[in-house]
Amino acid sequence: MRLGSGTFATCCVAIEVLGIAVFLRGFFPAPVRSSARAEHGAEPPAPEPSAGASSNWTTLPPPLFSKVVIVLIDALRDDFVFGSKGVKFMPYTTYLVEKGASHSFVAEAKPPTVTMPRIKALMTGSLPGFVDVIRNLNSPALLEDSVIRQAKAAGKRIVFYGDETWVKLFPKHFVEYDGTTSFFVSDYTEVDNNVTRHLDKVLKRGDWDILILHYLGLDHIGHISGPNSPLIGQKLSEMDSVLMKIHTSLQSKERETPLPNLLVLCGDHGMSETGSHGASSTEEVNTPLILISSAFERKPGDIRHPKHVQQTDVAATLAIALGLPIPKDSVGSLLFPVVEGRPMREQLRFLHLNTVQLSKLLQENVPSYEKDPGFEQFKMSERLHGNWIRLYLEEKHSEVLFNLGSKVLRQYLDALKTLSLSLSAQVAQYDIYSMMVGTVVVLEVLTLLLLSVPQALRRKAELEVPLSSPGFSLLFYLVILVLSAVHVIVCTSAESSCYFCGLSWLAAGGVMVLASALLCVIVSVLTNVLVGGNTPRKNPMHPSSRWSELDLLILLGTAGHVLSLGASSFVEEEHQTWYFLVNTLCLALSQETYRNYFLGDDGEPPCGLCVEQGHDGATAAWQDGPGCDVLERDKGHGSPSTSEVLRGREKWMVLASPWLILACCRLLRSLNQTGVQWAHRPDLGHWLTSSDHKAELSVLAALSLLVVFVLVQRGCSPVSKAALALGLLGVYCYRAAIGSVRFPWRPDSKDISKGIIEARFVYVFVLGILFTGTKDLLKSQVIAADFKLKTVGLWEIYSGLVLLAALLFRPHNLPVLAFSLLIQTLMTKFIWKPLRHDAAEITVMHYWFGQAFFYFQGNSNNIATVDISAGFVGLDTYVEIPAVLLTAFGTYAGPVLWASHLVHFLSSETRSGSALSHACFCYALICSIPVFTYIVLVTSLRYHLFIWSVFSPKLLYEGMHLLITAAVCVFFTAMDQTRLTQS
């Protein structure tokens, strides 16, 4: 069976997406879960260690507090309370910590540090995984056991005001609630006022047991202007006033209740130096946790060095405080200072309940639980506890009793710590079988792509895929039988659950058939290669073709990037690798231009994709012999040398272009500091987004939009030009409406809205331009001779994507878009055309620049840099599919725009029937190499110290990038099929 190179590459990438999906499902482990049902009272709590018939405490201890108020301030990092900002802007909170009856901690959140997983950790005590980052966009109902579920089952009345994520996680759990949206980050005032306005009314009432307040304003300020914004201090002062009001009210009501009240101040996650969150930096994982109650002994607190605890400890502590069962999936331990004022017997009882719950969870998730040090400590603690009870029943007051009780306490606390660590470590249990299946599929695809290079890059760009030979069929059925046998053996002997084993036989069989077919094709292609004995050449069609310095740079650069993925520091700072590669590429292009225009060509030019310019377009093809045609001024003239064609100013522009591109890249590096090592350092982006420089940002945004229009409109139809101009004007109006930039005639306007109308105004023009481009492409299939119509159609699709990117980019990132278009223009006019690069080289250059611009946007391999606000531009409610697509495009706009420009360039500047196929194949290959290498690396490094903080987020990025590549290859193939239809 014969397939075009592009179609073949697209099929390979689609299969590779399936393989990486299976690998990701196996790599990100299932969380630790209890098999017991989460119903209140489904089973009685474990009795206290028996010391005779007189000790039979089988009921839950009574609650320690009458009412509990939880004030959760989104993105409240620890130094906002315990640092200089807290002393300055939160004086009442500081007073409570230093002199009041309170216990202060730094609660460490595990990555991913985004809101929904952190709420789950606080209320269930379990450790959410990275898959919760995706679910965070649309939080579904939480089915796990939690403090909220237990409180509702116990008949407690819960009132909630704040982030609507809680309402989605706990539907029908609140007797009263008012949810606020968290996606309009430009709103940091009204979103908190909507919470505070309920306080006076609800505090006067006494018909509730738990009050939860979730304030979003601080998080929104961080997303807008970072942690050093002057707005941070104002918001902290506002929160301090709220805390004082609540605390004063609770104190005044304690005379009416037999038990004291508890006020909890905490954050869900912190805030990075760029104002975002999601990763594992100290600023993102450390949050304050302050427990305030008159039940606590008044003693000075250390505001500078509070004790560090785990965020998962909050669930167990709240459950004990409210007299509820500890959530069954909790891996946290009781914060002992909360109960240290209680009698010794109650303290031991609380600790025993916690260790019993953790030991049960350990038994259900660890086959060899009896050998676990924590379980052994637990059993020893129980025995000592029994001895203490026996002594307690004999004599209630003695020094021996106190000393033994203190020993039991220490033993329980050690057991709690060890059990919690053991259970947390279970999160790192991997589904090796699923990982191996995914790895094998990806390896087979990469091997097939590498073996197909000689055929795929020939002039016809076609491959012979042997599927019907008798040898193929015999090998295929043999491999199917072997894989089926392995699957049965693994799935019937696996001790732990396996995702791939849980699939239906139809789905698992389909994957095995696919893997078998790929292996058979690889064997057939490898046999042909070995029999043919061909050695790799740049041009498989011509034996004398040679490798240029640029080709060697591409090979060495790709290999160097792949090798760098094995080091955590290089993964964190991957942007440096791409900056180095594009800078080196510019220097290599500069050398090539100087050699061509000053030294001249010493011999015939290298063979490859050569451009011939005519007044209706240009042609290019892989040549069968030396002497490629060069750039022509007129179709009817001869083929003068490059130095004869390009003279005067145009020649100097060719020579200067690499250096201009270098200058642009240097400016863009200063715009957004990314990575880890230098992310905290000031950059132009921070300077522009500060409230003191809104005028400068407005001017820069307007100039960038003007440059975008000038560079894009040249290839558009008149209708699309008008739509583009109005759309870019709408982009500025949208940013002005939400308060990011200013209108010249309203410099001091404080009328800030969500910009819904303005954004939808732009969407209309985006869809209109894309529709016009698609219409022209379809028309070009009917009118085969109208080559210009297809060129205009492709450019209009590209223009629509540029307009969409302009809408989604933050104002300070609009220069990134403008410089991207400028560099594409310079490369097209002064480098790719005159220097006669082939399709493979042009494709790799587009890929490299696309990757560099991914990081120029401020992205990194850190989840915290994903701008989720892009997914909600123009939306007044959450709509899942548009939100996900817009967020993905906003994040990967750089690679997508460079890939779409590549399609237009190869379709319009060349008429080679193989150019698009070659480009699609090269694009798939250069993306597949790092994907396979990285999944092998993360498999071997799965127990590395930084596997969750560094390597796992990068793995998610690689998976998403592969999905984007698959979409790009589909577009390549569609355009290539258009060419085949016309021919």
Swiss-Prot record:
Gene3D superfamilies, per this entry?
Alkaline Phosphatase, subunit A
- Entry's transmembrane regions: 432-452, 471-491, 506-526, 552-572, 699-719, 721-741, 752-772, 789-809, 812-832, 879-899, 919-939, 955-975
Pathway listed: Glycolipid biosynthesis; glycosylphosphatidylinositol-anchor biosynthesis
Give UniProt keywords alphabetically.
Answer: Disease variant, Endoplasmic reticulum, Glycoprotein, GPI-anchor biosynthesis, Intellectual disability, Membrane, Transferase, Transmembrane, Transmembrane helix
Any coiled-coil regions, as ranges: none
Q: Could you tell me the superkingdom of the organism this chain comes from?
A: Eukaryota
**InterPro entries named in the record:** Alkaline_phosphatase_core_sf, Phosphodiest/P_Trfase, PIG-G_N, PIGG/GPI7, PIGG/GPI7_C
Gene Ontology BP annotations: GPI anchor biosynthetic process
Q: What is the effect of changing R681W?
A: In NEDHSCA; uncertain significance; shows a mild decrease in phosphotransferase activity
Subcellular location(s): the record lists: Endoplasmic reticulum membrane
Please state the protein's primary subcellular location: endoplasmic reticulum
According to the record, glycans are attached at N194
Gene Ontology molecular function terms on file: CP2 mannose-ethanolamine phosphotransferase activity; phosphotransferase activity, for other substituted phosphate groups; transferase activity
Q: Which family does it belong to?
A: Belongs to the PIGG/PIGN/PIGO family. PIGG subfamily.
Q: What disease does the record describe for this protein?
A: Neurodevelopmental disorder with or without hypotonia, seizures, and cerebellar atrophy: An autosomal recessive disorder characterized by delayed psychomotor development, hypotonia, and early-onset seizures in most patients. Additional variable features are cerebellar atrophy, ataxia, and non-specific dysmorphic features. Some patients may have the Emm-null blood group phenotype.
Q: Tell me the function of this protein.
A: Catalytic subunit of the ethanolamine phosphate transferase 2 complex that transfers an ethanolamine phosphate (EtNP) from a phosphatidylethanolamine (PE) to the 6-OH position of the second alpha-1,6-linked mannose of a 6-PEtn-alpha-D-Man-(1->2)-alpha-D-Man-(1->6)-2-PEtn-alpha-D-Man-(1->4)-alpha-D-GlcN-(1->6)-(1-radyl,2-acyl-sn-glycero-3-phospho)-2-acyl-inositol (also termed H7) intermediate to generate a 6-PEtn-alpha-D-Man-(1->2)-6-PEtn-alpha-D-Man-(1->6)-2-PEtn-alpha-D-Man-(1->4)-alpha-D-GlcN-(1->6)-(1-radyl,2-acyl-sn-glycero-3-phospho)-2-acyl-inositol (also termed H8) and participates in the eleventh step of the glycosylphosphatidylinositol-anchor biosynthesis.
Q: What is this protein called?
A: GPI ethanolamine phosphate transferase 2, catalytic subunit
Record the organism. Answer: Homo sapiens (Human)
Gene name of the encoded protein: PIGG
